């Protein structure tokens, strides 16, 4: 959790694609290396912590939606590809399924429900929030998944040794 918050803080000026990809990498790695409950704890607590220190979502109503999207990502990765030596095909399936599911979760909850029905936003805020929680979420979840596929196996070996 601390690593995730530190990465968000350090990379916040680098844009959504860098920060989001690294956040998703850490979320996936947490689930695969610490187990489902450890990964879910990081997934749910990270947007709360990020919001509380001013580096997360700008609106408190968005925090639970981000936590839900993170939890979906971790849950699907762990369910599909948690085996210590999961074949690359299972990892690829996890990458696609989890990235699409996180994207759809955030898009439907934030863009299609919170923005038009719950939040009171001006036109510019609506455009920014809608853009942030649409297609870029799919890309950053996929990049985070690729990075996890590359980094989790050597991390597991390093910890085992």
Where in the sequence are the language-model features?
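Loop-helix junctions at membrane interfaces
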Residues: 1-161
């Amino acid at each position: 959790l601390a690593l995730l918050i530190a990465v968000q803080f350090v990379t916040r000026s680098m844009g959504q694609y860098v920060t989001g990809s690294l956040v998703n990498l850490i979320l996936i790695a947490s689930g695969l290396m610490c187990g489902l409950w450890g990964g879910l704890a990081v997934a749910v607590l990270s947007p709360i912590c990020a919001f509380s220190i001013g580096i997360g979502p700008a609106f408190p109503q968005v925090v639970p939606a981000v936590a839900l999207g993170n939890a979906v990502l971790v849950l699907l990765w762990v369910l599909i590809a948690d085996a210590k030596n999961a074949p690359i095909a299972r990892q690829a399936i996890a990458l696609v399924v989890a990235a699409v599911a996180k994207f759809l979760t955030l898009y439907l909850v934030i863009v299609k429900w919170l923005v038009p029905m719950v939040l009171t936003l001006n036109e510019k805020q609506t455009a920014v929030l809608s853009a942030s929680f649409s297609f870029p979420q799919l890309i950053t979840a996929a990049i985070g998944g690729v990075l996890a596929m590359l980094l989790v196996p050597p991390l597991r070996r390093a910890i085992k040794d």
